[in-house]
Amino acid sequence: MTNFKNYLEAKVNIRGNKNLNYLSSFFSETELAILSNKTISIVGTNGKSSTANNIAMLLKGLDKSYIAFTSPHLFDYKERMTAHKDLNFNEYIQYLENFELKNNINLGYFESTFLIAAKAFLHNDMDYFICEAGIGGKYDTTSVIQSKTVVLTSIGLDHTDILGNKITDILNQKINVSDNIETLFVSVLNKELIEIIKSQYTNYSQSIYLSEYLISKNILFSNLIFKELN
């Protein structure tokens, strides 16, 4: 059996595969439906990982089962995939290897860790998949989930070569991580962006929660999310 650490080390210099149709086909329709219902997708310029970790901490306190997928890691790849219990990710490598062979593609590091985390979540029948987006949202690898629950932490001028030069362009890129949003949590943003969210996204969002808390106090933001979801 291939060791997950060795598998990932071989991916370090491989360019990521952004063909979302390919990546989506890694999952069955049933699996995608489960992911859509049970995933908390987190997008934003700053505060994504800390928000994800705070939500995970709150879930663990109530004995809820979860996997939190975040990036990047500081010391060890396992930091990207934390769960309420110890998991052996080695047993899921075969899924990736078969997928790459079948489609004649090489997955990048980010794609590999994301797909493994999602597969482990599905196979362990967990309550929540907390999923931090990589860059942007609309064309991000994690958008294959089409989550019904999306969290927007903050908006700033990042990756403008990919996401656009205007704050409004970046906002649209990030929120459109899913076209299937039913519940949207938004941390403090400027008035213009709040008005855009209220006017443009109420058509497909059943509930929009605007937090009064700054992202620097995102434990409070995370508590708001946690309260509404439970």
Task: Indicate residue ranges for each PLM-predicted region.
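Short functional linear segments
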Residues: 1-44, 53, 57-64
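Class I S-adenosyl-L-methionine
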Residues: 9, 60, 97-100, 198-203
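ATP-dependent carboxylate-amine ligase catalytic core
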Residues: 20, 24-35, 61-145, 157, ...
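Short, hydrophobic alpha-helix immediately C-terminal to the catalytic nucleophile
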Residues: 53-57, 115, 223
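Short, well-ordered alpha-helices that flank and scaffold nucleotide-derived cofactor binding pockets
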Residues: 56-61, 119, 123, 199, ...
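Acidic, Mg2+-coordinating active-site environments of NTP-dependent enzymes
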Residues: 124-132, 147-230
